[in-house]
Amino acid sequence: MSKTYFTQDHEWLSVEGQVVTVGITDYAQEQLGDLVFIDLPQNGTKLSKGDAAAVVESVKAASDVYAPLDGEVVEINAALAESPELVNQKAETEGWLWKMTVQDETQLERLLDEAAYKELIG
């Protein structure tokens, strides 16, 4: 069973074992508007928490998406190259950005649960 976390940078994380799926929240995609391009990290990229890992570009602006944890990218959502609008349509499911391994599970303890994230976006 997966557990979901959120960051103050408006990312969601779904944790299953040692693999974390990362995406931007529905709130974030609403703020950005229609996405037109997404630049994802490459498989095998080693990320440190806080690294700019991806870029989401909308008709309004381009925004960095930051690595929420230390780890290595093991899969990217290749469908987004042809269909970046998946993030607008299904940000917290089919619009995921990348999957990564977790190096330090204690970093999860510093993330937000759903209630804390809802309070943040209030």
UniProtKB/Swiss-Prot annotation:
Residues recorded with modification N6-lipoyllysine: K60
Keyword Acetylation in record: no
Lineage: superkingdom: Bacteria
CDD domains named in the record: GCS_H (cd06848)
Matches recorded under PROSITE patterns: BIOTINYL_LIPOYL (PS50968), LIPOYL (PS00189)
Gene3D superfamilies assigned: 2.40.50.100
UniProt xrefs under SUPFAM superfamilies: Single hybrid motif
Keyword annotations of the record: Lipoyl
One GO BP annotation of this record: glycine decarboxylation via glycine cleavage system
UniProt family annotation: Belongs to the GcvH family.
Record's protein name: Glycine cleavage system H protein
Organism (species): Bartonella henselae (strain ATCC 49882 / DSM 28221 / CCUG 30454 / Houston 1)
Gene name of this polypeptide: gcvH
